[in-house]
UniProtKB/Swiss-Prot annotation:
It comes from Acinetobacter baumannii (strain SDF). Signal peptide: none annotated. The gene is ureD. This is Urease accessory protein UreD. Keywords: Chaperone, Cytoplasm, Nickel insertion. Its main location: cytoplasm.
Length: 291
């Protein structure tokens, strides 16, 4: 029996232990969900096929709308050969103020050869007083492609709330086969000087990262340099605080500012361009973003 299932079934503590497993495969000219399993309050809200190429758009929802102290939330998602899945959420995620215990989120993404995964959750809000630990592990096979992002908002901006208590620990790793391509680790506590330092957050409330791995045929320096220059031109036209770098053949974008909508618009625009360059696909934003 799955460890998460055991904990969920036997624990009497007032915490949520939730896990969602999804598998996607290509069948009859479109991507379908071949595997779905969940424990606790997390599930697929809806699947859509808005693109002529049969790309599957899946909306995942966590009904408590956030993660509180003691909660454990796990996502395990896999795409099989030729599958193309776009995964998003219906609204902002939340790390709630702690009850004294740490909250955990684990994301495991496995992208098989010749498949594409787009992982595009909406922003996550870190409430003042939250104790949050998040880990993301992405494993790509040799010819797999990936586009994904993570957006973090410190405090509730509508209440002019700052992050003065609590702590946040985030680990991100992106692998191709057994080779580590990207490793990011971030840790800070409420009120840290790093939050106001020009070497850190510089008193900004929104920080975000975007990663993209092209199909194998576009991984040469010729194509990568050409595409990153086109993205730089896009960012300049949009006049947003985004920086771009290449880590081997991984395109990385970073946002640091105070407006999460500008971040979302910038990342969505980058994603739209890369879809056109790499996959010859239209932008086709998830419909839930328009509601």
């Amino acid at each position: 029996m799955n460890r998460i299932q055991q904990t969920f079934q036997t624990s009497s503590a007032p915490f949520w232990y939730a896990q969602l497993e999804l598998g996607f495969c290509y069948e009859n000219s479109r991507t379908i969900m071949s595997h779905r399993k969940h424990y606790g309050p997390v599930r697929v809200q809806k699947m859509l096929w808005p693109e002529k190429t049969g790309v599957c758009h899946a909306i995942i929802v966590h009904p408590p709308a956030g993660i509180a102290g003691g909660d454990h939330l796990t996502f395990q998602i896999e795409t099989e050969r030729q599958a193309h899945a776009v995964i998003t959420t219906p609204g902002a995620g939340k790390w709630y103020r702690t009850n004294g215990k740490q909250a955990f989120q684990h994301i495991y993404l496995n992208v098989k050869d010749d498949s594409i995964l787009e992982w595009m959750p909406q922003e996550t809000m870190l409430f003042d007083g939250a104790l949050a630990h998040s880990e993301t592990d992405i494993h790509l096979e040799q010819t797999a492609s990936f586009i994904g992002w993570d957006m973090l908002v410190l405090g509730r901006q509508a209440r002019a709330e700052n992050f003065v208590q609590g702590g946040y620990h985030n680990q991100f790793k992106l692998w191709r086969k057994n080779k580590l391509l990207v490793a990011d680790t971030l840790y800070f506590e409420g009120g840290d000087r790093w939050l106001s330092s020009c070497l850190g957050m510089n008193n900004q409330a929104v920080m975000a990262s975007f990663w993209a791995v092209p199909p194998e045929k576009f991984r040469s320096s010729f194509y990568l340099e050409q595409h990153i220059e086109l993205i730089r031109e896009l960012i300049m036209r949009m006049d947003v605080p985004v920086t771009l770098t290449l880590l081997e053949d991984v395109l990385c974008a970073r946002f640091l500012g105070n407006d999460v909508r500008r971040c979302h618009d910038a990342f969505a625009a980058i994603r739209a361009k890369l879809r056109r360059y790499w996959f010859d696909l239209d932008e086709e934003f998830p419909r839930i973003w328009k509601t």
